[in-house]
Amino acid sequence: MKHIPFFFAFFFTFP
């Protein structure tokens, strides 16, 4: 659980 911000950013940045 260390890639939470990265994962969220990737998911949120998706169109």
Curated annotation (Swiss-Prot):
State the function annotated in the UniProt record.
Answer: This protein is involved in control of the biosynthesis of phenylalanine.
At the top level of its lineage, which domain of life is listed?
Answer: Bacteria
> Sorted alphabetically, which keywords does the UniProt record give?
Leader peptide
The protein's name in its UniProt record: phe operon leader peptide
